[in-house]
Amino acid sequence: MTFFTYNGISSADFGLHIESKNIFSAPEYDISFQSIPGRSGDLIVSNNRFANVKVTYTVFVRRNTVEDLSDLLRAVKDWLYTEPDRYHEITDSYDSLYLRYGVISGSLDIEDQLNKVGCFTVTFNCKPYRYKKDGLLETSVTSGSSLFNPEAFSAKPLITLTGSGDFRKPAAATTKYLVRKSLSP
C-alpha cells in the first residue's frame, strides 16, 4: 500500500489510499525581472533563494457506514491540523530515500461519494529542499578525511568538533558551515 507520513503518523494508519500525487515538482528559483527603458531585454535580479514548494496527495477512504466515515475523517483532520504553525517531517512510499519538512496548507474539501467514500486532496507547503535520510545520520570523520556531497545542490552540514586541547582554525580558512566546538579539558 502506498502512503505518506506527516508528523510521525502514516496515512496508512487511517486506511487512506493515495489516488494521485504531486511530489516530484521542483521549487521555483526566486528571481525578478527588471525592465530598463531604452535597453532591450530585462535584467535578472536574484533573491538567492528557492521558494517553498507545494506537495499534494489526492486520497480516498472507504467505510461501511456514514458514521464510521465521519469518525475517521474527524480523526484525519485532528492528525493533519495538529501544530499547524510549524514544519513537520513528511515522507512517503514513492520517494523513500528522502524526506521533506512541510506544514498543512489550505483547507480539506472532503467529497463524499455514495455516503461511504471520502475523497480529498491534502496539500503541504514544504521547504524547497528534500533531505536524503542517510545524509542526516551522524558521521565520524578523522583528521585528513573528506566530506563529499553526492547531490547537485550545495549543502551546509552541521559540524561538531570533539576532542581535547586547543582548537585552531587557520587564518586563511573560510567556512560557511555551522561549527559547534565541544572540546574536553
Each PLM stretch: what is its role?
Residues 1-7, 88-90, 168-172:
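Short polybasic amphipathic segments
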Residues 42-67, 116-129:
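Oligomerization/assembly interface segments of phage tail-like spikes and tubes
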Residues 45-46, 111-112, 145-147:
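Beta-strand-rich interaction surfaces with strong enrichment in secreted/lumenal proteins
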Residues 132-185:
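Intrinsically disordered, low-complexity segments enriched in serine, threonine, and glycine
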Residues 71-80:
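Short amphipathic alpha-helices in soluble, non-transmembrane regions
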Residues 79-87:
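Short helix C-cap/helix-to-loop transition motifs enriched in small/turn-promoting residues
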Residues 86-130:
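Short beta-strand and beta-hairpin "edge-sheet" elements
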Residues 1-54, 97-109:
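Solvent-exposed edge beta-strands and adjacent loop segments
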